A protein has these predicted regions:
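Generic protein-terminus/edge-of-domain signal
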Residues: 1-66, 70-72
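Short acidic-glycine-tyrosine-enriched beta hairpin
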Residues: 69-81
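Short hydrophobic/aromatic patch on the recognition helix
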Residues: 77, 229, 278-279, 283
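A hydrophobic/aromatic-rich effector-binding and dimerization subdomain
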Residues: 91-153
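An amphipathic alpha-helical interaction segment
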Residues: 140-199
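A short, Lys/Arg-enriched amphipathic alpha-helix from helix-turn-helix/homeodomain DNA-binding modules
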Residues: 184-222, 243-262
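Terminal helix-turn-helix DNA-binding modules in bacterial transcription factors
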Residues: 235-274, 296-298
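…primarily DNA-binding HTH/wHTH and HhH modules…
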Residues: 280-298
Length: 298
């Protein structure tokens, strides 16, 4: 099957022109009401990349969307987040939809740290589902942005726009925290699977063959994006996946140091370290003792 070549929209203005909008209200940000578009179906069955961030809120059921490796058929009250320069593939679309799309350039957010907004790295099957009350909160902030867009550009516009975008994203962090709580039974099962996978990785000798396990390895095994997996684990345990992996690794090391006569180098290689000194450094950082000192005291 021939791969569809993506259509690239480098800027907010380029995207607005493609929608048939000759007048761009601001070159770095725009709010698009999907029901104002003449024919959404024309954008279906196509791959896109964009040089800007986009946040899409859908009021009604939409067609399929592929983002990264996953496909999702999403429903009412759903928010999707797309980072710049990622492939977005749309399936068959209907002619019209109810919803809002917020698009903004990375240049707008200069001076604002984007790293806390990890949901831009989530897969589409990890979308945010919002309540009516949450939807109204976001709608009110979008209203502020629309007011600024209609007002015209002055020396305050950029800062006010960026602050309102950041406010929306901060609310989305809160709403995702709520979603993690309401999904706790499902997420607890994922945590149990993660623990089993972690145990098996060392029990089956994968560490010696493939190296120290990575967060990406377990996220892939659970069919989650690395960002969503990290936030899920943090919400469930208070620790990052990397911290849990290191804790498990040190527990394995303690066991081997006290129950075998293997050298420190042999243990390091068995646990996936290419260089024993890296293992010794991590062990001392975690325990306050070198492996040799720990073995001597055991």
């Amino acid at each position: 099957m021939k791969m569809i070549q993506p259509i690239h929209f480098p800027t907010v203005s380029a995207f607005m022109h493609a929608l048939g909008r000759a007048d761009v209200r601001h070159p770095l940000i725009e709010v698009i009401h999907l029901d104002d578009l003449a024919d959404c179906s024309a954008f279906g069955n196509t791959r896109y990349t964009m040089g800007f961030y986009s946040v899409v809120y859908k009021d009604a059921r939409c067609g399929t969307v592929r983002y990264g490796r996953n496909e999702y058929d999403y429903d009412n009250g759903t928010l999707l987040f797309f980072a710049p320069d990622h492939d977005v593939e749309l399936g068959t679309l209907e002619q019209s939809y109810q919803g809002v799309m917020l698009i903004f350039s990375p240049a707008l957010m200069q001076g604002i740290q984007m790293s806390p907004y990890t949901f831009f790295g989530y897969s589409v099957n990890e979308a945010l589902h919002v309540s009516e009350r949450e939807r109204q909160q976001l709608h009110d902030i979008l209203g502020n942005i629309e007011t600024e867009l209609e007002r015209g550009i002055d020396r305050h516009t950029r800062q006010l726009m960026a602050q309102n975008v950041a406010l929306i994203l901060n609310y989305c962090i809160r709403f995702y925290d709520r979603q993690f709580i309401t999904r706790e039974p499902v997420d607890s099962q994922l945590m149990q699977r993660f623990t089993v996978l972690l145990d098996d990785y060392f029990a089956q000798g994968l560490a010696a063959r493939q190296g120290v396990p990575t967060v990406r390895y377990f996220a892939d095994a659970l069919n989650l994006s690395a960002n969503y997996f990290g936030d899920l684990v943090k919400a469930q345990t208070g620790n990052s996946p990397q911290q849990l992996i290191q804790q498990h690794l040190i527990a394995q090391a303690r066991h081997r140091l006290t129950t075998t006569t293997d050298t420190v180098s042999q243990i390091a290689y068995a646990l996936g370290f290419e260089y024993p000194q890296y293992f010794s450094r991590l062990f001392k950082k975690q325990t306050g003792l070198t492996p040799q000192e720990f073995r001597a005291q055991a």
